[in-house]
Swiss-Prot record:
Organism: Stenotrophomonas maltophilia (Pseudomonas maltophilia)
Name of the top EC class for this enzyme: hydrolase
Subunit structure comment from the entry: Homotetramer.
Binding-site list for Zn(2+) 1: 105, 107, 181
SUPFAM superfamilies: Metallo-hydrolase/oxidoreductase
Keyword Zinc applies: yes
Main location group: periplasm
Family indicated by similarity: Belongs to the metallo-beta-lactamase superfamily. Class-B beta-lactamase family.
Transmembrane segments: none
Catalyses which reaction(s): a beta-lactam + H2O = a substituted beta-amino acid
Protein name (database record): Metallo-beta-lactamase L1 type 3
Disulfide bonds: 239-267
Signal peptide per UniProt: 1-21
Amino acid sequence: MRSTLLAFALAVALPAAHTSAAEVPLPQLRAYTVDASWLQPMAPLQIADHTWQIGTEDLTALLVQTPDGAVLLDGGMPQMASHLLDNMKARGVTPRDLRLILLSHAHADHAGPVAELKRRTGAKVAANAESAVLLARGGSDDLHFGDGITYPPANADRIVMDGEVITVGGIVFTAHFMAGHTPGSTAWTWTDTRNGKPVRIAYADSLSAPGYQLQGNPRYPHLIEDYRRSFATVRALPCDVLLTPHPGASNWDYAAGARAGAKALTCKAYADAAEQKFDGQLAKETAGAR
């Protein structure tokens, strides 16, 4: 039952990444289990001159290195903290160097290790009000999944508004609210370089609605309207490179190494595909209600 709940809660019908025989997967939690690829360690993968994927083969955690310290966007599952710190060390980043943690949303597979990372590094967390509330509850009383996918709670240190910017070491991170998958879902954009040339990176949150009641949802009455706005928001992002919390959603394959982003989607293609799937889910729900 617990596995089934998590499958509805977090899995978004993505292709599993290939696992590596050289790396032993991180252990499953006792409370619930996830696909093994979500726990498959990987070495840091370079996305741009200062941006690295340091999570697992099927969960994104982005490290952005600046002259004034590092920024982490998402952390994956609760048991990933030590793996992330090891990958930071491989990039020359000490625990004290981690200054800021940003979130796509506050589900267990993206905010799971935040409490431990804060304790071990002293990093501050910035999130919008909706994500901050869910983070402080450790994912409990989720709008769709109740207490099925909890994790150690943590407090946000800074509440951000839509369009707000945070600058670390000359790199400007902009928050773009894209409510839907959760009310606090957020895309983050910044400009890095590749071989000295500017590249605009968009880290856009999930646009899936796995098992959600879309119409007449008593806990989220404006869900459909929020999703529609978020599809438009993602299409309009400054976006030379798109990454997503679950890499398969944007056609990244982290296990492919240097060719990991060879088939990556544009922001427009990502939003278009997600909206088409959403419309199909909505039509099926409507038909079932007749």
